[in-house]
UniProtKB/Swiss-Prot annotation:
The gene is mscL. GO terms for molecular function: mechanosensitive monoatomic ion channel activity. The chain crosses the membrane at residues 14-34, 40-60, 67-87. It is found in: Cell membrane. This is Large-conductance mechanosensitive channel. Its main location: membrane.
Amino acid sequence: MWKEFKSFAIRGNVIDLAIGVIIGGAFGKIVTSLVNDLMMPLLGLLLGGLDFSALSFTFVDAEIKYGLFIQSIVNFFIISFSIFLFIRYISKLKKKDAEEEKAAPDPQEELLKEIRDLLKEQTNRS
């Protein structure tokens, strides 16, 4: 049982997933701070000093904090858009690397092509 767990835990996909979750959590905190500490106050200034986190109403004895919900929606869209831009950038880098690999042929392959062409010429002369 221990060997199975060890092989599962050391498998590349599990480690990659764990690293992704940790980095994603840290990235989420950065974006949340960006939204809460920079963007929302600026948006509040543009809207006449409106503070979204203070928006609420009382229903019976419950306080409904819809301003915090609006702020969470803004966080979601900014995080989603940031991740989209990051993935798009990484995809372009991968595509560029793939094109560079195709553009630079392997020297051995070129040598083999030359040998093949020389053999064809010799065969055609005979």
